[in-house]
C-alpha cells in the first residue's frame, strides 16, 4: 500500500452516530399516522440504508404513491431535527485530531444527500475539519460506484490509492476497491445481526474508532 495521505469516512454509522435522530424522525412519522413507535434497537441497524429502508420498515404494506408521500414527510421531519442527539462516535474526535496531527487529510463520502449532509456538519461544527465532502448527489453516481470515491480523492488532492476508506456497509468496501482504495469495515456501525461483513472482502476492520490509529501509523508519518 502506498504511503497513506488521506482517510475518507462514510457518514452514518461510521463517523457520526446519527441513529437517534433518524429513528426519532421515523417514530414521529409513525405517531403522525396513528401507528405504534418502533423500538430503537429494531431500527438502528437499518439506518445506513437510508430513509427509504426506514420508511419501508415502518410502513411495509403501503402503495408506492403513498410510500413516496410518507418518505417525503419523513425527510421533512428529519431535516428539522438533524442534530438533536447525533454526535461523533466515541473516540472519533481523537482520531480526527490524530489524522490532522500526522499531516494527513480527511474527508467524507456518503450516500446521504447534500441538503442533509451539509447542514448536519455545520450544526455539529465539523465542516472545516474535512478536506472534502462528497454527498449522494454531488456526482452522478453513488456508492458502490467508484465515482464519488475518485471525486473525493481529487478534491483532497491525493491519488486514490493513497486514501484509506472506512465504512460500515458492503457498498463501502465495493466502492473503495473499485476506486483502488483499501477499505476498513467499521463493525461498531449499523451492521445487522448476523451480517457476514467478513465476506465483503475488506482489508481489515475496526471495532471502535480508536482502532484506526495503528493504520495511521502505517502511513509512515507517525
Predicted segments with their positions:
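Generic C-terminal helix-cap and adjacent flexible tail
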Residues: 2, 102, 210-222
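N-terminal helical cap/lid subdomain that shapes the substrate entry/recognition surface
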Residues: 2-94, 100-102, 113-115
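Conserved SAM-binding loop
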Residues: 15, 88, 106-109, 141, ...
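A structural signal for hydrophobic residues in beta-strands of small regulatory alpha/beta folds
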Residues: 15, 134, 185, 205-206
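Substrate-recognition/cap helix-loop segment adjacent to the acidic, metal-dependent catalytic center
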Residues: 31-33, 37, 54-61, 85, ...
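Short secondary-structure boundary segments
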Residues: 111, 137, 169, 187-190, ...
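Structural recognition of alpha->loop->beta junctions
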Residues: 126-133, 196-214
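Acidic, Mg2+-coordinating phosphoryl-transfer loop and its flanking beta/alpha structural elements
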Residues: 164-204
Amino acid at each position: 500500500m502506498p504511503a497513506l495521505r488521506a482517510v475518507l469516512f462514510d457518514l452514518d454509522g461510521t463517523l457520526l452516530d446519527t441513529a437517534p435522530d433518524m429513528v426519532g424522525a421515523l417514530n414521529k412519522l409513525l405517531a403522525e399516522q396513528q401507528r405504534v413507535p418502533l423500538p430503537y434497537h429494531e431500527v438502528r441497524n437499518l439506518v445506513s440504508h437510508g430513509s427509504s429502508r426506514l420508511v419501508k420498515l415502518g410502513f411495509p404494506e403501503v402503495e408506492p404513491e403513498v410510500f413516496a408521500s410518507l418518505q417525503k414527510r419523513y425527510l421533512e421531519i428529519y431535516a428539522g431535527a438533524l442534530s438533536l442527539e447525533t454526535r461523533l462516535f466515541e473516540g472519533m474526535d481523537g482520531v480526527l485530531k490524530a489524522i490532522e496531527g500526522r499531516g494527513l487529510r480527511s474527508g467524507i463520502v456518503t450516500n446521504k444527500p447534500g441538503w442533509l449532509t451539509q447542514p448536519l456538519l455545520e450544526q455539529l461544527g465539523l465542516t472545516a475539519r474535512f478536506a472534502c465532502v462528497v454527498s449522494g448527489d454531488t456526482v452522478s453516481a453513488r456508492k458502490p460506484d467508484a465515482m464519488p470515491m475518485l471525486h473525493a480523492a481529487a478534491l483532497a488532492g491525493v491519488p486514490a490509492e493513497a486514501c484509506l476508506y472506512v465504512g460500515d456497509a458492503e457498498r463501502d468496501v465495493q466502492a473503495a476497491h473499485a476506486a483502488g482504495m483499501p477499505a476498513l469495515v467499521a463493525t461498531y456501525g449499523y451492521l445487522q445481526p448476523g451480517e457476514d461483513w467478513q465476506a465483503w472482502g475488506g482489508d481489515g476492520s475496526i471495532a471502535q474508532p480508536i482502532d484506526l490509529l495503528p493504520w495511521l501509523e502505517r502511513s509512515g508519518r507517525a
